[in-house]
Curated annotation (Swiss-Prot):
Family: Belongs to the UPF0162 family.
Pfam families with a match to the protein in the record: Transglut_core2
Organism encoding this protein: Pseudomonas aeruginosa (strain ATCC 15692 / DSM 22644 / CIP 104116 / JCM 14847 / LMG 12228 / 1C / PRS 101 / PAO1)
Source lineage: Bacteria, Pseudomonadati, Pseudomonadota, Gammaproteobacteria, Pseudomonadales
Disulfide bonds: none
Name this protein carries in UniProt: UPF0162 protein PA3419
InterPro entries referenced in this protein's UniProt entry, alphabetically: SirB1_N
Amino acid sequence: MDPRQACLDCLAQEPPALFEAALWIAAEHLPAYSPAHALRELDELVRQIGASLDDRASASERAQGLLRRMSEQGFCEDDDFPLQPRSALLPLVLQRRQGQPLSLALVAMELARRLDIPLVGVNFPGRFLLRVPQADHLLDPATGRRLYTPDCRELLLRLQGPKSELQAAYLKQASPGEILQRLSRNLRQLHSAAGEPLAALKDAQRVIELGPVGAADHEARAGLYRQLDCPQAERYDLERALLLSDDPTEQLRLGQRLGELAPPTSRALH
C-alpha cells in the first residue's frame, strides 16, 4: 500500500485514525517498519498502563495519571542536540521511548483513546500540549505537568519572546489534520537540518497536501527545490508564497528571490 494514500485514508475515516495515519507518515521514511507492528507494541502498553489507572478518578486525574505512567515506562522528551528525525518518527519513538513533545502526545492520545480517557491535542506555539475537554488547565505531554493560564503565558514568553501575548487560538483543540501537518512540518525541519533534502521534500509535499497552508510552507518547499536544482518547481512555490503573503517585507524578499531565478524557458515553435 502507498504510505501517503494510506495516511490520507486514515485521516478520512470517521472518526479519523490519527495514530495510524502518523505511523503511515513514518512508513514513507522507514519502509522496513510495519504500522501493524507498532500497533501491537501499543497493545502491550495499553495492558501495562491501563491496569495501573484508577477507573473511579476524574478524567483529568486519569489523563495526568496516564502521562505519569508513560514516564515510569521510560517515555521522555528527546534531548539530543541537534535533534534527529527519529524523534518524530513514531515507530522509533516507541522503540526508544524518546521523542518530541508532539510524538509523545500522539502516543498518549492513542493510549487515552483505547482507555476511554478524553484527551485532545493543542497546537500551542513552540510546544505541542494536551488537554482534557472542559478542564481548566493543559498538560505537558513529556512530564504530565498541569499548565494553568499563568503557566501558559510564562511558557509562551519563554518560547516566543517578550513581545508575545497569549491568545485564545493558542489554547484551542487541534484537528487531526492540523496535528498531522505539524508532525510533517517537524519532520521537514528535522530532515532538512540532517542534510536529507529528498526526505524533507516528502514532508514538505505532505504538509501542503494535508490542508490549508501559508506562505512559509511554500517558501520552505521552494528552498528544498533550490537544493535539489529544480528551478521551475522553486519558481512555482515562490510565486505561491508571494501570492499568500500579506507582509510587505516578506513580499519584497520573495520578489528578490524570484528575480534571482533564470526566466522560464519556452520551446520555440517551428
